[in-house]
UniProtKB/Swiss-Prot annotation:
GO terms for biological process: 'de novo' GDP-L-fucose biosynthetic process. It is an enzyme of class 1 (oxidoreductase). The record marks 172 as: Lowers pKa of active site Tyr. It catalyses: GDP-beta-L-fucose + NADP(+) = GDP-4-dehydro-alpha-D-rhamnose + NADPH + H(+). The active site is at 168 (proton donor/acceptor). The keyword Secreted does not apply. This is Putative GDP-L-fucose synthase 2. One of its GO terms (molecular function) is isomerase activity. The record marks 139 as: Important for catalytic activity.
């Protein structure tokens, strides 16, 4: 297997700075649409959105594998795949995902599998010798619970991740640091992004895996079908969050592959900040549930505010397009098409 040579003078592929300037312009991702692009995790919410975006842009050589075809947690299988396929671009969107309750219930499983996926893909991309650019998708769970708001990229490792999030966050932090390490030691143009509170088609709906928007959709829809007079929601509803539609992230991925080659990771957030109460009312309206939302202020609701500073991403020319209510409608349509023929009515 050909391997990436160690850089004798540090990061030979440090093609750009925080604004995406420098040598990155000499190698155009959008001008290389016949090159082989490997999307790891193409069946998930993020990977499928990236796949749709590349197809729409006319990329003709996108390579994907199901988990049955390629177990990304198996080092030998990943190395054999890279040696055979020799992709030019790699986008790592694969992960074992679930809410805080799921990862807290199986911490070793989440930590180990996500570390293996990250290490295997980044190392194989570095070793195979064909990869021109690698993008690792992390998560805003990497930041401490007491990070400044909006949270800048520089808040990474200024404290531990929020309690309960660490089993998912630690492998994501490792992915960012691996990108920096292979860039410094081998000159590979490896970059990372940290999207915030993603939602969209293919978001999991089972209670043990879902996040707030799909959970609210499922609960309000069930209450509407059953004629329930109220739906209980934890907390006071005062906590503020931002939510980023996965199609906006897919556009950000293309922008990053085209314009960014900096060492530091990049936040990706919509900038549309809402309270959980406003979110619940928006979901209730989209679903058409006419009952009451009963707020249980005795229950925990997390940190008071969680928003990321996406100024670096916006300097690259990216702007989110999907308004929150439109995104909720999009996800509800997906839920009705793909979930409501089976357990979604009764779970």
């Amino acid at each position: 297997m050909p391997s990436q040579q160690r850089s004798s003078s540090g990061s030979t592929a440090k093609a750009g700075d925080a604004d995406g300037d420098g040598d990155a312009a000499a190698v155009s991702f959008l001008g290389d649409k016949s090159a082989k692009v490997f999307i790891a995790g193409h069946r998930g919410m993020v990977g499928s959105a990236v796949h749709r975006k590349l197809d729409a842009l006319g990329f003709t050589n996108v390579v994907v594998r199901t988990r049955a075809e390629l177990d990304l947690a198996c080092q030998a299988a990943v190395e054999a795949f890279f040696a055979a396929e020799l992709p030019r671009y790699v986008i790592l969107a694969a992960a074992k995902v679930g809410g805080v309750h799921a990862s807290s219930a199986a911490p070793a499983e989440y930590l180990t599998e996500n570390l293996r996926i990250t290490v295997n893909v980044v190392d194989a991309a570095r070793r195979c010798g064909s990869v021109r650019k690698l993008l690792v998708l992390a998560s805003s769970t990497i930041y401490p619970a007491d990070a400044p708001q909006p949270t800048p990229e520089s808040a990474l490792l200024t404290g531990p991740p929020a309690e309960g999030s660490e089993w998912y966050a630690i492998p994501k932090i490792a992915g960012i640091k691996m990108c920096q390490a292979v860039r410094a030691e081998y000159g590979l143009d490896a970059i990372a992004a940290a999207p915030n509170n993603l939602y969209g088609p293919r978001h999991p709906f089972p209670p043990e895996h879902s996040h707030v928007i799909p959970a609210l959709i499922r609960r309000f829809h069930r209450a509407k079908l059953e004629g329930a007079g109220e739906v209980a929601v934890w907390g006071s509803g005062a906590a503020a969050r931002e939510f980023t539609h996965v199609d906006d992230l897919a556009e950000a991925v293309v922008v990053l592959m085209e314009r960014y080659s900096g060492e530091e990771h990049v936040n990706v957030g919509s900038g549309e900040e809402v309270t959980v109460r406003e979110l619940a009312e928006a979901v209730r309206g989209v679903v058409g549930y006419e009952g009451v939302v009963a707020w249980d202020a005795a229950r925990p609701e997390g940190v008071a505010r969680r928003v990321v500073d996406s100024g670096r991403m916006r300097k690259l020319g990216w702007e989110p397009r999907v308004a929150l209510r439109d995104g909720i409608q999009d996800l509800y349509r997906f839920y009705l098409r793909h979930e409501c023929g089976g357990q979604a009515h009764h779970a």
